[in-house]
A protein has these predicted regions:
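Beta-rich catalytic cores
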Residues: 25, 70, 119
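Short loop/turn segments immediately following beta-strands, especially the blade-tip
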Residues: 52-56, 95-102, 145-150
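Conserved beta-strand positions in repeat-built beta-propeller and related beta-rich domains
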Residues: 1-3, 39-43, 83-89, 132-137, ...
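A short beta-strand motif characteristic of beta-propeller blades
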Residues: 15-20, 59-65, 107-113, 151-154
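Short coil/turn segments that connect the beta-strands within blades of beta-propeller domains
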Residues: 34-36, 79-81, 129-130
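Conserved small/polar residues in nucleotide/adenosyl-binding loops
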Residues: 205-212
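Conserved blade-ending motifs and adjacent loop-strand segments that build the rim/top face
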Residues: 152-168
């Protein structure tokens, strides 16, 4: 969040299970297999790994940090046992050492997107597929994790898509973008992949390249 904080909330009882203040405009967080939490901070240009033992919800400082320019996203890949993050016009594959009290991340490989892409923003697993959606300021891709290829996506708008979320069969894939006439980090609607509005006047925060 723009205030610099991050929290993990248990939906069942709304309890804050974990919270910290990495600063640098945190945009995304992911729980690692050992329970530790990794946070992507955009203006901080880094990933922060926090040791979480389940006893104390507040963790004052990260155990490990890794520079990643304009870090906006992190996704754990259970099948491959790796962490993904997209930055600029690249998708990075990271290895996690699995040491809960001494965590480390290292880059294994990078995958380049097409020329002209800038400011990667969202990275989201595609429900039921071995793939992830990746959005930049100019384009939306589906990355096939097995084939290691970026695929074009049929969507009502390619540029400035800030968030994509999928669900099981019967649920729409939902998309968020900054809405015209307002602040460029807010959206007043949620759409499907064809641009049909599913919710209106919801005033949801989407973030934007300007706040990176």
């Amino acid at each position: 969040a723009s205030g610099g904080g991050v929290a993990l909330i248990r939906i069942a009882d709304k309890k804050a299970m974990f919270y910290a203040k990495p600063g640098g405009n945190p945009h995304s967080a992911e729980v690692l297999p050992d329970g530790n939490v990794v946070v992507a901070s955009s203006t901080g240009n880094l990933l922060s790994v926090y040791v979480y033992n389940g006893a104390d919800s507040y963790v004052s400082r990260p155990a490990f940090t890794m520079p990643v320019h304009s870090a906006h996203n992190v996704v754990w890949d259970r099948k491959r046992g790796c962490l993904w993050t997209a930055t600029g016009a690249q998708l990075l594959k990271l290895a996690y050492n699995g040491k809960r009290t001494a965590p480390e991340l290292t880059q294994v490989r990078s995958y380049d997107m097409a020329a002209g892409n800038t400011d990667a923003h969202d990275l989201a697993p595609v429900c039921g597929e071995d793939a992830m959606y990746v959005s930049t300021n100019q384009h939306v891709y589906k990355f096939d994790c097995a084939a290691e290829k970026f695929l074009d996506v049929q969507i009502f708008q390619q540029n400035t898509i800030k968030s994509i979320s999928t669900g099981p069969e019967g649920y729409s894939t939902i998309v968020m973008r900054p809405t015209s006439g307002g602040s460029n980090w807010w959206s007043a609607e949620v759409c499907d992949m064809k641009g049909n509005r599913l919710f209106n006047r919801c005033l949801l925060y989407t973030s934007d390249a300007a706040d990176e």
